[in-house]
Amino acid sequence: MGKRKVSILEPAATAVAEIALFIESKGLPQTAKKFVDEAFEFFLKLSDERIEHKPCTYNQWKNLKYRCVSFKKKYVIAYLSQEREIVVCDFVSAKLLK
């Protein structure tokens, strides 16, 4: 029982940064920083090998064998779960997947 390595792909990191930039543009720089910190802390929590989330229902992600988890009820994180590594592949608004 332990932790797996967490790798974050560029599309996921870029999506978090774009959301933070939007929050900051609304005059909320501390909120933007907090959002980024919370998102990346959440990514690291995915490393717990005891936790396995459901496969994604979004067809393109389902075909890629991604697993999905909700973040703050507004976003979806898509990741690949491997024996020794979690690969965070995407981070999107849940509204875009409907």
Please place each PLM-identified region on the residue numbering:
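Basic, Lys/Arg-enriched alpha-helical interface segments
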Residues: 1-65
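Enriched for short, Lys/Arg-rich terminal
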Residues: 26, 71-98
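Short solvent-exposed loop/turn micro-motifs enriched in small/polar/acidic residues
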Residues: 61-62, 70-72
